């Protein structure tokens, strides 16, 4: 005959078995992909694209479309690149310093102008279309004016870099503010946010995805403007990527010229991936946005 103590012990034993079963299931859950697998999954498409580009490049050289001293293949170009890598890195430092300095100033100007235009109907009516017009204007068209105003100097390049980047930054912020949900602004007003607090805690965070897109585009315009400027405005004593590109072209050293082009391309890719790509991923995670590039 079962006693109450025996029944209680049986129930306790059954509960222990069920809990241990749950623990077993929990420990047996399949783990996610390893870090190496994640790195490989992210890297192989890029590596494949590089290999395909190199193969196509070499096939074009082999086709005899141009003599190999005019269009060298990957091997002599990479030999020139690694053979003089220190010089290219020094030149890249000069170019990047110019680029970041101009972009930082454009960031300040573009943010201020974008915030004012987005929140002021009169300003939007007066200069809204002008900002878009400045954004579409080729950077090379500014250099004659820049040289007239600032002579052949760093300021001439700085002037064009700022004009290349600021309109895109301003338009990115304007677009982000225009697409803010009205309920967020009403909630900020109810909670007592006014002017600067409204902009700092409500408007800017809500507009951040579009604003970062504007920053990314602004950097692209700044980088293109900068390299165009270094090809046109040659400053003695300032060894830059643009100057090195022009010198190699003048000397007919086309392998070295293309090596500089590769350095310029790699810098553009790295800045986009490490700076803007990282910012975009963090914003997507923070705002719960879907990564359209995934799956």
Q: Whereabouts are the PLM-identified features?
A:
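A membrane-interface signal for the N-terminal entry of alpha-helical transmembrane segments
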Residues: 101, 251-280
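Transmembrane alpha-helices
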Residues: 159, 163, 195-229, 259, ...
């Amino acid at each position: 005959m079962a006693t109450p103590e025996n029944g209680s012990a049986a129930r306790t034993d059954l509960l222990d078995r069920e809990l241990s079963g749950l623990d077993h299931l929990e420990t047996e859950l399949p783990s996610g992909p390893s870090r190496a697998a994640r790195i490989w999954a992210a890297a192989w498409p890029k590596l494949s694209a590089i290999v395909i580009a190199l193969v196509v490049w070499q096939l074009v050289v082999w086709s005899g479309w141009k003599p190999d001293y005019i269009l060298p293949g990957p091997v002599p170009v990479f030999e020139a690149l690694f053979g003089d890598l220190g010089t290219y890195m020094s030149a890249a430092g000069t170019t990047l310093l110019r680029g970041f300095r101009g972009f930082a100033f454009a960031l300040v100007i573009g943010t201020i102008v974008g915030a004012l235009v987005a929140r002021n109907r009169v300003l939007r009516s007066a200069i809204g279309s002008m900002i878009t017009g400045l954004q579409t204007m080729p950077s090379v068209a500014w250099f004659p004016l820049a040289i007239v105003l600032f002579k052949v100097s760093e300021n001439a390049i700085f002037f064009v870099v700022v004009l290349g980047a600021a309109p895109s930054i301003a338009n990115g912020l304007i677009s982000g503010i225009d697409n803010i949900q009205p309920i967020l602004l009403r909630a900020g007003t109810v909670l007592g946010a006014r002017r600067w607090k409204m902009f700092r805690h409500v408007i800017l965070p809500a507009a951040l995805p579009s604003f970062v897109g504007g920053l990314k585009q602004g950097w692209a315009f700044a980088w293109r403007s900068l390299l165009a400027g270094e090809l046109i405005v040659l400053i003695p004593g300032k060894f830059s990527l643009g100057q090195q590109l022009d010198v190699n072209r003048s000397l007919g050293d086309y392998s070295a010229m293309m090596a500089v082009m590769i350095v310029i391309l790699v810098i553009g890719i790295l800045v986009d991936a490490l700076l803007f790509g990282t910012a975009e991923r963090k914003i997507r995670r923070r705002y719960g946005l879907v990564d359209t590039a995934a799956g």
